[in-house]
Amino acid sequence: MTHPIKAAITVGEPNWAPLELVLPARELEAFMYMGRSGEIELYKHCITRRYLNISADGQRFYRYSDGTYVEVTKAVALDHVRNRDQ
């Protein structure tokens, strides 16, 4: 894991590549592109309303906590975004 990241969110042309690398095609339509924070792409799940934050290369995952992005495992990130009961 790396140190927490603080960066402003910018919105521009959607970058779907990181999401396409980590999710099966049948799940992609459940996400909205929300923007970018530094090198982290931000996607929001339409049903759970939770964010899936993925590095631009699709290799690292982050949770937003106390004003910073903290690296988590892929399993933790996917479980968080898919589970409304947490």
What is each of the regions a protein language model found here?
Residues 1-2, 44:
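Compositionally biased, low-complexity segments enriched in small residues
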Residues 22-74:
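Acidic, low-complexity, intrinsically disordered interaction modules
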Residues 2-24, 64-86:
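Mixed-charge, Lys/Arg-enriched low-complexity segments
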